[in-house]
């Protein structure tokens, strides 16, 4: 047993590291466990055993070429020495030729994100995804099932979120708008976007009720939260509020990504306002508006509190409050999800974020939050009406 523990503690994963969104931003490297000390367990341990494959307490990752519901007996890489190093290049084809690298990348990105969210408050009591909750609250038995190269679709991805105690399921697809086709597992923003659906569905209305984002506007905000976290996590050291970001650009092979507008604090580059949601029937279109507001919030808080060292994975907290504006924005947005009602609208979600900041910092960021929302028409006088919103 001692030798197995030694191997696990020295596990290696060859991946695009945290902060590199896709193959255009950097190179793969070999990383060693552990990166983060959280209250959850090791990535390859669940309290019942050690797994010399892409399985652990937080996630189980495998290929799923048929697109079917089975996963436990599906193929996943195995390494008795816990060395997960496999070849991949953008020129390799077909995708099945690099399935080991794809599964390993998906497993890595998801586990890092789990640990970051844990520090920010998405833990066992909040309804996170873990097999073993270590008697810390919530319901266990629900790691995230991660399907790489899932055969049930293309040019997309999804995450199914049942109530706490039942595993979530992420399906990652290949994208065929380029030659060779591209694997969404190598675009971290897509993985983070999908996992965040699990987070927002578990937090809104409580972990026992995962249907609280089922309405059009709340579902749209679900897409927006997912884009927001994917974007906040990929910030670079030299970024400023003048930096714009796309969503899904690499996988889709579209220079402007898969949203109508880039995420930008410029009203010229991204003119989205609250009232633009009138008449929209697409949750992704509504989400583009909501995430644009959150991007304003992100930069208002960064300008006030600094960006921190974005090359470091672990959020730094003092008395439970993130010390940098980036993680502070992520924290109050997370906390707001838990405070808002079931089936919230933009106004209610905005108010929940204000309440979250009041609970966390005694409201010291109230002005920055109001300015962010008011800039895009969700100020003090904004009123929700599904067909005719009032901007302010």
From Swiss-Prot:
As cofactor, the record names: Zn(2+)
> What does the Swiss-Prot or TrEMBL cofactor note state?
Binds 1 zinc ion per subunit.
Secreted found in the keyword field: yes
Q: What Gene Ontology cellular-component terms does the record carry?
A: extracellular region
Q: Where in the cell is it found?
A: Secreted
Keyword Glycoprotein listed? The answer is yes
What is one GO biological process annotated to this record? Answer: proteolysis
Task: Give the protein's biological function.
Answer: Secreted metalloproteinase probably acting as a virulence factor.
Q: Which domain of life is it from?
A: Eukaryota
- Annotated InterPro entries: Fungal_virulence_M36, Peptidase_M36, Peptidase_M4/M1_CTD_sf
Give me the glycosylation sites of this protein. Answer: 176, 359, 385
Propeptide, chain numbering: 1-9
Binding locations of Zn(2+): 193, 197
Q: What is this protein called?
A: Extracellular metalloproteinase 4
In the UniProt record, what gene is named as encoding this protein? MEP4
Q: EC number(s) on record?
A: 3.4.24.-
Instruction: Give the annotated active site.
Output: 194
The Swiss-Prot or TrEMBL record describes its family as follows: Belongs to the peptidase M36 family.
Could you list this entry's UniProt keywords, alphabetically sorted: Glycoprotein, Hydrolase, Metal-binding, Metalloprotease, Protease, Secreted, Virulence, Zinc, Zymogen
The Swiss-Prot or TrEMBL record annotates one GO molecular function as: zinc ion binding
């Amino acid at each position: 047993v001692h030798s197995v523990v030694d191997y696990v503690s020295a596990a290696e994963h060859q991946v695009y590291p945290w902060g590199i969104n896709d193959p255009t931003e950097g190179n793969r490297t070999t990383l060693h466990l552990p990166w983060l000390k959280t209250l959850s367990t090791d990535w390859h341990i669940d309290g019942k055993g050690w797994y010399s494959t892409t399985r652990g307490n937080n996630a189980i990752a495998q290929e799923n070429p048929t697109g079917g519901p089975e996963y436990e007996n599906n193929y996943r890489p195995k390494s008795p020495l816990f060395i997960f190093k496999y070849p991949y290049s953008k020129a390799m084809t077909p995708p099945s030729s690099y399935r080991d690298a794809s599964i390993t990348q998906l497993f890595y990105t998801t586990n890092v994100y789990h640990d970051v969210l844990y520090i920010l408050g998405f833990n066992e009591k909040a309804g996170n995804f873990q097999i073993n909750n270590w008697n810390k609250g919530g319901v266990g038995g629900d790691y995230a099932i991660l399907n790489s190269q899932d055969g049930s679709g293309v040019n997309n991805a999804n995450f199914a979120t049942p109530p706490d105690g039942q595993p979530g399921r992420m399906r990652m697809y290949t994208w065929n708008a380029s030659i060779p086709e591209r694997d969404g597992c190598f675009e971290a923003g897509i993985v983070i976007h999908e996992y965040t659906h699990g987070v927002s569905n578990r937090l809104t209305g409580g972990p026992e009720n995962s249907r609280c984002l089922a309405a059009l506007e709340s579902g749209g905000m679900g897409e927006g939260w997912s884009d927001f976290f994917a974007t906040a996590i990929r910030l670079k050291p030299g970024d400023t509020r003048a930096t714009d970001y796309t969503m899904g650009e690499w996988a889709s092979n579209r220079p402007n990504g898969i949203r109508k507008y880039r995420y930008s604090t410029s009203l010229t580059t991204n003119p989205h306002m609250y009232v633009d949601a009138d008449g929209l029937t697409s949750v992704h279109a509504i989400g583009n508006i909501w995430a644009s507001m959150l991007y304003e919030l992100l930069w208002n808080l960064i300008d006030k509190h600094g960006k921190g060292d974005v090359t470091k994975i672990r959020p730094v907290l003092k008395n439970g409050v993130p010390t940098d504006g980036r993680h502070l924005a992520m924290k109050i947005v997370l906390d707001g999800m838990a405070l808002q009602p079931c089936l919230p609208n933009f106004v209610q979600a905005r108010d929940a974020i204000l309440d979250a900041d009041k609970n966390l910092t005694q409201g010291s960021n109230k002005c920055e939050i109001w300015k962010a929302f008011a800039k895009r028409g969700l100020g003090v006088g904004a009123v929700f009406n599904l067909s005719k919103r009032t901007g302010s």
